[in-house]
Amino acid sequence: MDALQLANSAFAVDLFKQLCEKEPLGNVLFSPICLSTSLSLAQVGAKGDTANEIGQVLHFENVKDVPFGFQTVTSDVNKLSSFYSLKLIKRLYVDKSLNLSTEFISSTKRPYAKELETVDFKDKLEETKGQINNSIKDLTDGHFENILADNSVNDQTKILVVNAAYFVGKWMKKFSESETKECPFRVNKTDTKPVQMMNMEATFCMGNIDSINCKIIELPFQNKHLSMFILLPKDVEDESTGLEKIEKQLNSESLSQWTNPSTMANAKVKLSIPKFKVEKMIDPKACLENLGLKHIFSEDTSDFSGMSETKGVALSNVIHKVCLEITEDGGDSIEVPGARILQHKDELNADHPFIYIIRHNKTRNIIFFGKFCSP
C-alpha cells in the first residue's frame, strides 16, 4: 500500500476523532483529502518547525515526494467528476503583499496547478471576499454561496485555506423509491427521530467485526470508482450514540483492517439505510492545534520563508465546508428476477448511529469521513 495513502488515512482518522470529541452526539462530516492537499501545499512554503509540524500531523514521515504524490491523487480523483456529481475544491489564497518567491511558484506549479491563488486582502478586502465567494459558488455549481462569513478574513489575512466539497452519489444498484418508508431512527437507547429509510435486497460485500460488535458493509457507487463503507454497531449499547466502542478502537491500522476485502464476503443482504443530506461547515483550527500544529497559526512562531521573505506570516484561517447527499438514485439493479424469494443470509438495518467513509477505490484515499447520529 502506498505511503501517501497510509499517511492520508492516519490523518483522516486523527481529525475524525478530534471532531467526534467536539461533537459527541452530532453528525460529523469532512473531506480529509481536501484538507491534507491544502496543508501539504502550505508545507512546500514552510521551513523549520512549521514544516516539521505539518509533516508530523499529516504523517508524511515515510512519503518520499509529497507534492508529486498529491499531483497523482488529484489527477486520479479529478477524473471522477465525469462519473459523479462530485466537486473537491482545495484552495490556498495568499495575499499579494507576500511577493511569492519564484522558487516556490515553480515548485508548486505542476503538483498544485489549480490550488494556489494570489489575491489582495490588504487593499481590496471586500472585492476579494466577493471574488472568492463567487468563485467557490461557480466551482460547486451553485451549491455553496458566501463560503466566507464576514469575520473569516480581514485586511491582515496573509494565507487562507478554503476547502469546499460536495457529493451526490449514484449507487451501483439503485434503491426503489416506492420502498422508501418513514421509520424511527434511534438516536440513543431511549429517543427516536423519524427518518426516510431506503430499503433493498441485494448482494453486497459484508462482514462482522466481533472485537467491536459491529457490522461492516461496502456499498459501491456507479462504476465502482467510489464506495461507501458503513460501520454499524449491532445495537446501541452505551449511554450515548452506541459508537463509543468503535471510536475508541478506531485508528488507521484498524480501519485498514476492517475495510480489507478479507474481512468481508459477498452475502445476500436485506439492507435499510437512511436517505439523508448532511451539510457541515467545520472550523478545524482547534482540532489541528490539538493534533500538533502549534506554529502555523501564530505570526510569532510560523516560518513561511520558503514562499516569501516577508516576516510574521501565518496561516490566518481554514474554511472547510462539505455537503453529502445520499438518495435512492443509481444504476439499474442487476439482481436476478425472483431474487426476493432467496433465503436471506444477512441483514443490515442502519436505524441507529453509524460511522461511514466514502473511499476512492483505486488509490484507497478517503474522500469523505463522517458519522450519522441524527436525521
Curated annotation (Swiss-Prot):
GO CC annotation, single: cornified envelope
Subcellular location: Secreted, Extracellular space
Coiled coil (UniProt feature): none
Glycosylation positions in this chain: N99, N133, N188, N361
Molecular-function annotations in GO: serine-type endopeptidase inhibitor activity
Protein's UniProt keywords contain Methyltransferase: no
Keyword Protein biosynthesis (UniProt): no
Keywords from the named record: Glycoprotein, Secreted
Site for Reactive bond homolog, residues: R340, I341
InterPro entries to which the protein is assigned, alphabetical: Serpin_B9/Maspin, Serpin_CS, Serpin_dom, Serpin_fam, Serpin_sf, Serpin_sf_1, Serpin_sf_2, SERPINB5_serpin_dom
Biological process, per Gene Ontology: extracellular matrix organization; morphogenesis of an epithelium; prostate gland morphogenesis; regulation of epithelial cell proliferation
Tissue expression as described in the entry: Normal mammary epithelial cells.
Subunit structure: Interacts with IRF6.
Homology family: Belongs to the serpin family. Ov-serpin subfamily.
Function: Tumor suppressor. It blocks the growth, invasion, and metastatic properties of mammary tumors. As it does not undergo the S (stressed) to R (relaxed) conformational transition characteristic of active serpins, it exhibits no serine protease inhibitory activity.
UniProt protein name: Serpin B5
UniProt source species: Homo sapiens (Human)
Gene label: SERPINB5
